[in-house]
Amino acid sequence: MRKLLLSAVVVSLALGLAGCDDAKNKETNSAAAAKSDAPKEGGSLIIGITSGDPLAVNPLYASDRTTLTIMQALYAPLYSFNNGNIEWGLAESLTPSADNLSYTLTLKPNLKWQDGQPLTADDVVFTFNKLLDAKQHSFFRSMFTYGGKPVEVSKVDERTVKFTLPQVSAAFTGTLVQIYPIPQHVFAGEGDLEKSTKNDAPVGSGPFKFKEYRAGQYYALTRFDDYWNGKPKLDSVTYRFAKDSNAANLALQNGEINLKMVDPQDVNRLKNTGKFDFMVYPEGRLAYMTFNQNVAVMKSKALRQAIAYAINKDELTQTAFTSLDYAKPATSFLTPDTLYKTDDVEQYKFDLQKAKDLLKTSGAPDNLKLRLAYVNTNKTQESMALYIQQALKGIGVNVELMPLDSNAMSQRSLDMNNTAWELNLGGYIMGAEPDGYKSLFMSNEAYNYAHYKNPQFDALWDKGAVETDATKRADIYKQIQQTVTNEMTYYPIAYTNATVAVDKRFGGTKEAEPKPVYLFQDLSKIYQK
């Protein structure tokens, strides 16, 4: 018995020592792996872009995905929101007055533009004066106009700016988050900021500064060492333009690009390579179809409603996005992350007979033919377009598909007299503050792609912007959502998730904070392992 016990002890000690050796080996291996994955300075990140070249790389005008993505690296915001909490950027505080009719913004000390000039309160005041100037045609103007009167902006000292509101607005803080200052010393004296040649080589305050742009090829940036949030880890970031998703995916697999948004249809194939990490997150984005009321036939509410009833939205979403993991059928033009979003609106459940009955009363001619525009590099939009074409054939409406490149789509959409199509597919991300959506819906706004005009509807938007009682405000935005649905000015299709493939040789993506459209809040945190 004693011999057996001793043997047992010896075996236990041996196993214990072996375990220690295994543990040491694991610790050594883990330490080596951790060391290899640790953030390093240097290296280059190449981001694949399939949404076309940028337009005006200026924060007062950026509205398309490409321009917004590039702008986020070049310019810095005053602050941002993360899970509902303020994260300070160029600013360090924003203090409301006791009556909420003014706000005092304080900038961080020692801020610099990428050309070495100081960034001060003068730049913030200049930025606001320009966006409020009707001659500059910035879509932000309406967001800082309450009851027909603009916000007044004044300099207190080199780091302090005062905003004076014509009336109390619950929307102000949520709208100010969208503002990225532009440099006064660069743009002073420029007549038309959107068309200014100064946008060709931007001077910003973000983590990376402009190096070179070759149309149709790439947009190259280099590290800005005096960035307010610390020197970026990468030496450079380059946005490489691909003619379509297939070409970009091939470049991704070959290591020619390191990161890109991917279509749901491509995820499994890329996963099977084992080369990439994937980030899937809600975009706060609505995929939609617009009815262009510049074209006479689309002024018929009955026709717009007939089209809505002819589409099986659940089936459309499943077909276009391949899985409900990547999108959910939409119930309102407001996204789920937006304040006061409600499902208490007409949902237009698929009803072919009702669609046919409405079409008969719509005044539309027999053998109606409609043109449906979409971005030709967007696989999901192409799938949507094909589905809608077949769906409307079921009520006797012929649909001609109009695939366009991204820039052509954007430029035609901004034409207030556009009659190039009756229907078009698109998507937007507007944030948590519902007042931000009014630039898409009010009668004379440049981004009112539906060209729907209704003074009573405009008045609801004005009322919602200044109402401070949350219950009353919720009711106003409920009325707004019901109006959009009843009038069927926009057909909400799906709330989408973003899927981003990242080369496993890069880290810091979590710290960089994945963000809809922009890809990341702060590219300075990404590093090469």
Q: Residue spans of the language-model regions?
A:
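Alpha-helical secondary-structure segments
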Residues: 46, 120-126, 158-164, 206-207, ...
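N-terminal lobe/hinge region of extracytoplasmic solute-binding protein
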Residues: 48-98, 129, 203
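A structural "hinge/loop" feature
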Residues: 50-68, 90-92, 117, 172-181, ...
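Surface-exposed binding/hinge segments that line
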Residues: 95, 99, 142-188
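Gly/Pro-rich hinge or "lid" segments in bacterial periplasmic/extracellular proteins
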Residues: 177-232, 236, 357
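Ligand-site clamp/hinge motif
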Residues: 224-270
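Detector for C-terminal structural segments
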Residues: 311-338, 380-389, 414-529
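Structural transition elements
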Residues: 325-361, 378-381
